[in-house]
């Protein structure tokens, strides 16, 4: 055997002891994968050594110079496999240490590593989870969009249809587009984003549709859906079959005059819709019935109390031309189910105004020169229902006052007292209230007021429903002979009232103690409170939509106290469909749970050109 073969033999023996004979044998490998590669490397090394021994046992004269080169090539081949095994071993060794870091660290690491390094593997997974669930980083996800062809700045959300006449696939987000089409958008995230379009009659330019409202199918039309359309040219009533919602037909004549406002008051049997606005410059209201009839009520109103006990109780409304309240009752139904008529009466130097046909009305300007703004209905701790509203304000002799009346009449000192003669008022510490936000839903929810500040900015003040009720119930009032006991009573039905008690009630006493907010003020930086749309989804959340397409979020606790400051929830961009970028003012907001077990919450944002639905799961 030549010198070169001897050197190769010596080198291979050293490699065998270093690689194939090391302690990391297949039996000591920690994982099945490592054991497999260890056995493969061992077989490769043994094959190389067997080839080397064959070359060594062959006489040099038998293989000569060529044979020696063949053996050396075999040695080199084995050496290459050994290097490959060595590299693979290093990779597996590092892989095993990776498993050790996620499981039990080696003893030598426990003796030398600092304590924070040892705790890092345990803390890393929770830190990653908190990072992804952080409210500051979580963003709403685009769920679906609906666009209409004509941008309409007066587009609005409507009462969703339900009952036997509603189309299948609900619940719905209902909106009217500027193209004169009604859109029923499934709010359930499990339903496909398919809209039901109900064309409405409109004039040239598609610009005369102001708003409209769905009315459930009543007993007379159980299989149909009635749509009350409020147009610039008047009021129209349409009835459509639920199975063919696109085949709408005009079932009643139009009335001249426009509808600037629309409020609802469904009476249950038969269902009614009250549409109020101006007709020929004169404030008026219409009652639209599902049987195809339209009643001219003639009452000028801009605000209504929320639906009361399924529409079976009187309606509280405010006057447009004269700042006072009316109580329109439905006690004068006749055999044809016509609603009570309202008559036009002279009001001295103030001219003529439409008033209800009952004595339950405050005197003109008795509540200030600004029309009262109805806020919400809440129950006190005794279960008595009250309607809250805001009166007075900047530029008036009256300061901003928060007032309330019984939803129905009040029982005071053993007598029934008309509710409009028992208006209680209290000062609020958030002065110069210029705009009103929706209160959060549910009894005891906070009253939310948006107040005007310097430089066009504004602030949010919240008033706990429970604290507000206690303030009205337990604050001394000012009477004819000075301070007297709090005016505490129960709400009930109509009854006769002694004139002496009614005279005291008509004083509308101011509560001496000012109602202070339970939370706030929370600044609205750079936001004009006159151009903010608000949506309260419960005691915990308040959404604000701006005229820059943004949606802000304010979190509150159960008492209505804000938790932190106003945060940007959605910037109004990234809408897709070639319409990325700002969409214009937010015209409406609606929030729903999405329906179904585990379904994500959905926030619908209404713009002039369509509706964007955001999935809020994980972002609230």
UniProtKB/Swiss-Prot annotation:
Keywords from the named record: Host membrane, Host mitochondrion, Host-virus interaction, Membrane, Modulation of host cell apoptosis by virus, Transmembrane, Transmembrane helix
Tree of life domain: Viruses
GO terms for biological process, alphabetical: symbiont-mediated perturbation of host apoptosis
GO cellular component terms, semicolon-separated: host cell membrane; host cell mitochondrion; membrane
Topology of this chain in the membrane: Single-pass membrane protein
Coiled coil ranges: none
Entry keyword annotation includes Translocase: no
Transmembrane segments annotated in the record for this chain: 113-133
Cellular compartment(s): Host mitochondrion; Host membrane
Stated role: Plays a role in the inhibition of host apoptosis. Prevents host TNF-alpha-induced mitochondrial membrane permeabilization and reduces caspase-3/CASP3 and PARP1 cleavage induced by the intrinsic apoptotic pathway.
UniProt protein name: Apoptosis regulator MC163R
UniProt lineage: Viruses, Varidnaviria, Bamfordvirae, Nucleocytoviricota, Pokkesviricetes
């Amino acid at each position: 055997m030549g010198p070169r073969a001897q050197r190769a033999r010596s080198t291979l023996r050293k490699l065998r002891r270093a690689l194939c004979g090391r302690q990391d044998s297949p039996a000591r490998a920690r994982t099945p994968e490592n054991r497999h590669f260890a056995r493969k490397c061992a077989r490769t090394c043994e094959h190389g050594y067997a080839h080397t021994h064959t070359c060594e046992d062959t006489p040099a004269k038998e293989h000569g110079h060529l044979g020696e080169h063949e053996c050396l090539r075999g040695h080199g081949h084995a050496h290459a496999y050994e290097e490959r095994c060595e590299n693979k071993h290093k990779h597996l060794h590092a892989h095993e240490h990776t498993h050790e870091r996620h499981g039990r660290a080696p003893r030598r690491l426990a003796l030398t590593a600092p304590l924070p390094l040892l705790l890092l593997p345990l803390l890393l997974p929770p830190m990653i989870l908190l990072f992804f669930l952080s409210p500051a980083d979580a963003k709403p996800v685009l769920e679906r969009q609906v666009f209409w062809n004509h941008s309409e700045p007066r587009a609005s959300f409507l009462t969703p249809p339900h009952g036997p006449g509603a189309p299948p696939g609900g619940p719905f987000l209902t909106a009217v587009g500027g193209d004169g089409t009604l859109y029923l958008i499934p709010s359930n995230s499990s339903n496909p984003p398919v809209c039901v379009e109900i064309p409405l009659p409109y004039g040239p330019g598609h610009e005369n549709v102001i708003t409209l409202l769905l009315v459930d199918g009543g007993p007379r039309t159980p299989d149909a859906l009635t749509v009350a359309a409020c147009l610039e040219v008047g009021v129209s009533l349409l009835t459509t079959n639920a199975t063919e919602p696109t085949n709408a037909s005009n079932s009643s004549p139009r009335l001249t005059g426009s509808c600037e406002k629309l409020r609802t008051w469904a009476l249950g049997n038969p269902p009614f819709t009250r549409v109020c606005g101006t007709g020929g410059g004169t404030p008026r209201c219409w009652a639209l019935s599902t049987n195809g009839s339209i009643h001219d009520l003639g009452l000028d109103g801009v605000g209504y109390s929320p639906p009361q006990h399924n529409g079976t109780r009187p309606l509280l409304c405010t006057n447009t031309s004269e700042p006072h309240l009316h109580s329109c009752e439905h006690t004068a139904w006749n055999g044809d189910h016509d609603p009570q008529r309202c008559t036009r009466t002279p009001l001295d130097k103030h001219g003529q105004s439409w008033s209800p046909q009952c004595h339950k009305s405050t005197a003109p300007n008795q509540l200030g020169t600004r029309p009262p703004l109805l806020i919400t209905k809440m129950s006190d701790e005794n279960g008595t229902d009250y309607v809250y509203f805001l009166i007075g304000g900047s530029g008036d002799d009256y300061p901003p006052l928060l007032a309330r009346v019984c939803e129905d009449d009040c029982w005071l000192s053993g007598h029934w007292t008309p509710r409009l003669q028992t208006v209680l008022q209290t000062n609020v510490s958030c002065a110069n209230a210029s705009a009103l936000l929706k209160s959060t839903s549910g009894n005891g929810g906070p009253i939310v007021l948006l107040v005007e500040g310097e430089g066009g900015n504004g602030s949010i003040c919240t008033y706990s429903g429970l604290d507000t009720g206690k303030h009205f119930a337990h604050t001394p009032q000012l009477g004819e002979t000075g301070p007297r006991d709090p005016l505490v009573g129960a709400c009930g039905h109509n009854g006769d009232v002694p004139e002496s008690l009614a005279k005291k009630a008509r004083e509308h006493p101011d509560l001496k103690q000012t109602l202070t907010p339970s939370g706030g003020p929370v600044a609205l930086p750079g936001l004009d409170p006159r151009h903010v749309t608000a949506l309260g989804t419960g005691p915990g959340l308040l959404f604000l939509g701006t005229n820059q397409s943004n949606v802000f979020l304010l979190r509150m606790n159960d008492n209505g106290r804000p938790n932190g400051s106003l945060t940007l929830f959605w910037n109004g961009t990234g809408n897709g469909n070639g319409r990325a970028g700002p969409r214009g003012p937010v015209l409406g907001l609606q929030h729903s749970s999405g329906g179904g077990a585990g379904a994500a919450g959905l926030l619908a944002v209404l713009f002039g050109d369509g509706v964007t639905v955001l999935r809020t799961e994980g972002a609230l």
